[in-house]
Amino acid sequence: VSGLDTILGGHTHDGVPLPIPVTNPEGAVCLVTNAGSNGKFIGVMDMDIRDGQLKGIKYEMAPVFDNLIKDAPEMMSYLTDLGRRVYDENIVESRSKTYHYNKARIGKTFSQILNEKLAIAPDLLYRRGNFMGSWDQLICSALTYEYSSDISFSPGFRWGTSLLPGQWITMQDVMNQCAVTYGETYIQEMKGKQVLGILEQVADNLFEPDSYLQSGGDMVRVGGLKYTISPESELGERITDVVILSSNKPLVANDVYKVSGWAVVGDHPSGRLIWDIVKDYILRHKNNENILPLEPINHPTIKGMISNEGISGYQGELI
């Protein structure tokens, strides 16, 4: 778009420390900024404008420390009142009538529900890997356990806060990762070629060379199988070497597999809500010291990106 000098990005999940220069068809440069998610930073740009022209800029990401900022009385009052609200049968958590409300929560305040301590994190719990994160692995493991599925899918959401090793995992932390209006889960049978098609389609949404055809988000999170991805290949050629972990055998196009997942936007499934499945999984699998053992993160192998600086520090295999 011609005539724009700067775009201050407001919808992002990655803090970008310096503006990105983008050249338009006329040769002019537009500076694009993004300051990250969850209120961690405020993007601050000082512009030197003289004679009707932009002469220069100074940009920084100012960190936000909540213990250095005075609480807004009106907001604190609102949050306190909300925390005192009592959960009842009029609460609607699910689009499925079976799970409109949770009987186990009736009579408890919102604060009591959200502050429940579930287990202690033994390692960093994070969401924002391009292909997988430890929170994602936990969600996929919970789905696989709930439904005894061969494969589990979880959306590549780009939000959710991290927990440090040794911190308690509370119900609020689980909700931070799962709280959407379409949290119902499902179990269904799929042929191997359908599973491969899902992986290929999501990968195309992310890595389509034409940015106007990209859908955003991260790669779908997968439990129960491993695969190799070539981001720079074309649709239908990006996903290879797909192996079912439980059998250590290749995915077969016409074989049928049990697949679990959640976050269906259209016709809603009727399964339990994902946050209850994750909560129950944590409570069942923590040890006597309240520590939750975490399964190894199922990072895919990435092909053809070794020299790409954006993949620096990748915890999976690069070939």
Locate predicted features.
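Active-site neighborhood of phospho(di)ester-bond hydrolases with catalytic His/Asp-centered motifs
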Residues: 5-15, 32-35
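Glycine-enriched alpha-helix->loop->beta-strand junction motifs that scaffold or abut catalytic
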Residues: 2-4, 28-29
